[in-house]
């Protein structure tokens, strides 16, 4: 909804109902890999290969499962979280750059997940947001505008979520 309010021309596809070739043929100018249940490489459908293909070509944002796909694509460890976070908010501290530009730190973010990306983070990625418990809430590719957030920026209970998507 926020992306539509921001003027984006949105096309939505289930990750298991579109191929990479079909996605490429759409010639997107941005790509959002959205939430979903399951494990990133097992249940992510086209998402991991879409991240690999589009990184460096267009801006990419992975949300929740998409964030986990980003971590996994580059060899990061995705595993069970130390605590389940379904419908709970947490303060998130960030670096104030890229998707976090003009967003106060910390801010409250809505979370719905039972998996997280763990340290060590692959060399291609950097951690850009964490909780007070040091859970990774944001990743960025070091060379390209490819980001991942573990929380739900689209939730009304995430402060500044619309600004994050605008960035």
Show which residues each predicted segment covers:
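Short, charged N-terminal beta->alpha structural module
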Residues: 1-6
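Catalytic beta-strand/loop cores that center a nucleophilic Ser/Cys/Thr
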Residues: 96-144
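Proline-aspartate-enriched helix->loop->beta-strand connector
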Residues: 23, 27-29, 153
């Amino acid at each position: 909804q926020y992306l539509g309010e921001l003027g984006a021309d949105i096309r939505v596809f289930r990750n298991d109902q579109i191929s990479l070739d079909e996605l490429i043929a759409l010639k997107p100018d941005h790509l959002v890999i959205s939430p979903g249940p399951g494990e990133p490489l097992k249940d992510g459908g086209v998402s991991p290969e879409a991240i690999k293909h589009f990184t460096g070509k267009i801006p990419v944002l992975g949300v929740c499962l998409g964030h986990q796909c980003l971590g996994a694509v580059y060899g990061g460890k995705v595993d069970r979280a130390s605590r389940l976070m379904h419908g709970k908010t947490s303060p998130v501290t960030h670096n104030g750059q890229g998707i976090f530009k003009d967003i106060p730190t910390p801010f409250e973010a809505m979370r719905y997940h039972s998996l997280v990306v763990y340290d060590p983070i692959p060399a291609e990625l950097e951690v850009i947001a964490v909780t007070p418990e040091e859970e990774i809430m944001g990743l960025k590719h070091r060379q390209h505008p490819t980001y991942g957030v573990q929380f739900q920026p689209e939730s009304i209970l995430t402060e500044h979520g619309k600004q994050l998507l605008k960035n």
